[in-house]
Amino acid sequence: MLLVPAGILGLPVCRTGRRGDVFVLPTSFGLAGGDTMAVDFLALNEKAIAEFRANEGECGPPFEGTPIVLVTMVGAKSGRELCSPLAYSTDDDDLVVIASMGGAPNNPNWYHNFVANPDVLLEVGTDQYEATAVLTEGEERDRLYAAQAAQLPVFNKYAENAAPRVIPVFRLVRASS
């Protein structure tokens, strides 16, 4: 077993995290390293957010080459404003995000935030705009998942690991001006 961060890395976790928690997953997910490594994933997210904003939407390793959107949302339970960096793909003018949690058996916290409070603020590169998170279903969900998995093949593994959970897919629709 290897202890690693979750969240924006999209890696499966055994439990949801709070600052200082350690995340556990099998080394079969292609991670290199020693026996264990304790990582505060909220601190990792904060670092990625700062790097994103300092570099006009670009992030270095381990996110280099992955399209990242910063999504500011309202917490379902806390009512607080929260920001999560998420991998995305596009479909027409919309962004698409997948609540894979790296193939974990449960949905990420941001999934519950989107369901409770679908109005969000997106940061893509240097562009900021309001959007609505729309949960997709059926053929549309399947098509969008397949399209993102074609761009980021690790999502195929996430679907296998999550089974029988069907991983939710959200369309982020720009709000009308």
Question: Which residues make up each language-model segment?
Answer:
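Extreme N-terminal basic, low-complexity initiation segments
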Residues: 2-11
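Extreme N-terminal tail/first-helix region
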Residues: 25-64
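Short, structured beta-strand-loop surface elements
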Residues: 101-169, 174-175
